[in-house]
Amino acid sequence: MSHQSELIAQDINAYLAQHEKKELLRFLTCGSVDDGKSTLIGRLLHDSKMIYEDQLEAVRADSSKHGTTGEKIDLALLVDGLQAEREQGITIDVAYRYFSTSKRKFIIADTPGHEQYTRNMATGASTCDLAIILIDARHGVMTQTRRHSYIASLLGIKHIVVAINKMDLLDFNESVFENIKADYLAFAAKLGMKDVMFVPISALDGDNVVNRSEKSAWYKGQTLMEILETVPIAGDKNYTDFRFPVQYVNRPNLDFRGFCGNVASGVVKVGDEVRVLPSGKTSHVKSIVTYDANLDEAFTGQAVTLTLTDEVDISRGDMLVLARDQVPQSNHVRAHLVWMTEKFMQPGSEYLFKFASKLVSGQIESIGYRVDVNTQEHSQVTHLQLNDIALVDVLLTQSVVADKYQQNRATGAFIVVDRLTNITVGAGMVVEQLQAEQTTPVNYSEFELELNALVRKHFPHWGAADLRKLLK
């Protein structure tokens, strides 16, 4: 099936060992309706030989029923899995796909191109390292292009690849390519985008996707796959500011007490002095435990269990940082907020806010402005509705560690949860911490407390927070 099918057949252990060491790149594709996002992903999977024969046969059969490419096989059907999407020829949900080459592993997020699915795109973009912005060569930079680029920039994606698609319909005209490139760069400069690359492609025929095209001799740059395999992403991670949100306290016996979680950013070593937030107590790292073996140090992204030299009171939601670092905490932050539910958001409404592993109650205090995702213009509004993006001030009942999102995506992001239904209603990216304010405790009605108890009793899989504990 793949480039390593022979190695898999001969020595599966060697293949797995080699595969484990590969770097992982997460990227998303976004563009206007019919720009060819799903076709491009299908082409990447097909030309990198990551499609099973039975999958290919199924797509050939479906092409005659749902296909949009005439006699040619419709590779978009490899990705458009939902029946509603196939019948409409569009992408609604975020479709994730996995593939690998000899150099890297990839996770693709195929995101919706329509404005009414802005929340879906924001979800797909939140964990990505790179974005492929598709532009139809016949139409150039459009309103949707600006919207997707703005969202990618807002979500902290540092690498942008502009794939100018359907160049085959214009005979790979170099002047068309250069004009679109100039238009996009003028817009990208306003968003502060620095690493922007351009590739002329035909997703339908495969030109410059995986294999270099003979139709564009004037193009001397890399193919799309070469860019994906070589773009440097290791430097994008924050290895400076150690942040360790405690997810679980592990006590298998009386002699062991470890704190489990993912290293959100930075590096920690055995012997390092750490501070527990919010209590401020300090201790030293005694050991770094993993399933395979103990480590001398742990890096960003690793799931580990830390043990400390002292008996310190630590629970889920606490944050471990290096004692020498000055890490500010506040209960008042300014953030960009993506609203994700049909129920309007009115300033002053009470919600639960989840920062890393810490759940705290609070309110969206005020709306600074709403951003028009198509024009990036600001407007004053009294409430937010589905798919709105706005600058807001958030006031919490407790102080949290909230880094700037552009500096630390792991601890600069939060979600907003409806306190009764436990539904995620918004996602936020911290712009700055504001001066802490005194807050009055949230007063839940007896009905709200009883309803919350019933939800937790009969629907434990929803993971609803215990409101009574939040009042303590």
UniProtKB/Swiss-Prot annotation:
Enzyme superclass (EC): transferase
Pfam families found in the cross-reference section: GTP-eEF1A_C, GTP_EFTU, GTP_EFTU_D2
Signal peptide positions (record): none
Reactions that this protein is recorded to catalyse: sulfate + ATP + H(+) = adenosine 5'-phosphosulfate + diphosphate
Region G2: start-end pairs: 89-93
Sequence segments annotated as region (G4): 165-168
Enzyme Commission number, as recorded: 2.7.7.4
Region (G1) location: 31-38
Span of domain tr-type G: 22-239
One GO MF term: guanosine tetraphosphate binding
Keyword terms: ATP-binding, GTP-binding, Nucleotide-binding, Nucleotidyltransferase, Transferase
Pathway: Sulfur metabolism; hydrogen sulfide biosynthesis; sulfite from sulfate: step 1/3
Entry's Gene Ontology BP terms: hydrogen sulfide biosynthetic process; sulfate assimilation
Region (G5): 202-204
Subunit structure: Heterodimer composed of CysD, the smaller subunit, and CysN.
Family according to the record: Belongs to the TRAFAC class translation factor GTPase superfamily. Classic translation factor GTPase family. CysN/NodQ subfamily.
Function: With CysD forms the ATP sulfurylase (ATPS) that catalyzes the adenylation of sulfate producing adenosine 5'-phosphosulfate (APS) and diphosphate, the first enzymatic step in sulfur assimilation pathway. APS synthesis involves the formation of a high-energy phosphoric-sulfuric acid anhydride bond driven by GTP hydrolysis by CysN coupled to ATP hydrolysis by CysD.
Protein name: Sulfate adenylyltransferase subunit 1
Chain's gene name: cysN
